[in-house]
A protein has these predicted regions:
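Bacterial signal peptide processing site
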Residues: 20-23
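Surface-exposed loop and turn segments in beta-propeller and other repeat-based domains
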Residues: 35-47, 87-98, 137-148, 185-207, ...
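Loop/turn-rich, solvent-exposed surfaces of beta-rich toroidal or solenoidal domains
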Residues: 268-306
Length: 354
């Protein structure tokens, strides 16, 4: 009797492959070790009557800037060491040194640089000038940019006249590197839905919003998409964008709509929060993250994930209360978070990381 060993060998190889093949994680949280529980060390770090509606935090050195539109101004500056209130700045308007509402930016080297894609303006404020009580609100320079039909949701000033933008370029690319003369040095990384014909250029841009952070050298950046498990780690080398690592476990779920010149990208019942807020230091990228569905919870989380700049998971923290935004100090010693108390008042609390 002739016996064939080929089917048996094939089955054996299949079983061995099934045992050794790396299983794709269902959640970002599975990439990290057991979270470290943290308890708040300073529940009300800044004066409680100094905040209205917090929409973001950034920290660098001794400067803690809170996005908080109040009395016609966009931001409030606190001392990151003591919590002392210093001043409000970023007046809303169209005059010299004034900006549009909802302008986001990056804080580094004592400068807070914000942008508005509708007006194509980039505006810079000097933190030392603000601390010295300048009458002109710390405004130091402004310039316009022109990248054709490209649209930006976030912008970082890298220094030496270079800007890094995240958004949508040529209905295809997610990132752009350009200079103050509007010369485009590079574009990189295809957006997740570039081939999805249910999206046009406007709804595709709306479905690729997210958060962007950089390290102090301006050479490393990280960008995460809203309502997703997608985060990219990038480097800028000799005028080129290099994708260091891309962790794309679950794309956003959007319903694109357009009618009468009005465009929207709405979340679905299956959409989840994913990456909520990013912040960074020279060593790490911190990410506020939630696996919960949008319809089941608010846009907050008690889970903070920590990556190194190569995109490797390092550790995770579990806060004792849900946070809306986060910012780490440059020594990786403290984490500032925005919280809402039982009376729906905003406050900034601090967690010790060491």
């Amino acid at each position: 009797m002739k016996i064939s060993f080929i089917p048996f060998v094939s089955v054996l190889l299949a079983l061995l492959y099934g045992c050794t093949a790396e299983k794709k994680p269902e959640s970002v949280s599975e990439l990290f070790p057991v979270p470290i529980s943290l308890s708040c060390s300073a529940e009300s770090f800044v004066p409680e009557d100094s905040l209205a509606v917090v929409e973001g935090l950034v920290c660098s050195g001794r400067n803690l800037v809170v996005y908080d539109l109040q009395s016609g101004e966009s931001y409030v500056l606190f001392d990151a060491l003591s919590g002392e209130y210093i001043t409000r700045f970023g007046r809303i308007g169209q005059g010299p040194g004034e900006i549009s509402s909802g302008s986001y930016g990056c804080l580094s080297d004592g400068r807070f640089v914000v942008f508005d894609d509708a007006t194509k303006n980039v505006t810079a404020y000097d933190m030392d000038t603000l601390r010295n009580g300048a009458r002109h609100g710390g405004f130091v320079w402004r310039q316009r940019y022109d990248i054709g039909d490209g649209q930006l949701s976030r912008l970082a000033f890298l220094g030496n006249g270079l800007f890094f933008g995240a958004g949508l370029l040529d209905s295809h690319y997610q990132y752009i590197l350009f200079d103050s003369d509007n010369h485009i040095h590079d574009t990189a990384v295809e957006v997740y839905n570039s081939e999805d014909t249910s999206f046009d250029r406007y709804t595709r841009f709306l479905s690729n919003q997210g958060d962007l952070v950089m390290n102090c050298s301006g050479k490393r950046l990280a960008c995460a998409l809203n309502f997703s498990s997608n985060i990219d780690f990038l480097a800028v080398d000799e005028g080129k964008i290099r994708l260091v690592k891309s962790l794309r476990l679950k794309n956003p779920l959007y319903l694109p709509e357009s009618s009468g010149g009005i465009y929207s990208a709405s979340v679905t019942p299956e959409s989840f929060w994913g990456y909520i807020s990013l912040c960074s230091t020279d060593k790490y990228v911190y990410a506020l993250y939630s696996d919960k569905k949008v319809m089941e919870s608010g846009r907050c989380s008690s889970t903070v994930l920590v990556y190194d700049w190569d995109g490797n998971p390092v550790r995770s923290f579990q806060l004792d209360v849900p946070a809306f935004h986060i910012a780490a100090d440059e020594t990786d010693s403290h984490l500032f978070v925005s919280l809402m108390d039982e009376e729906h008042n905003w406050k900034i609390s601090v967690y010790d990381l060491k």
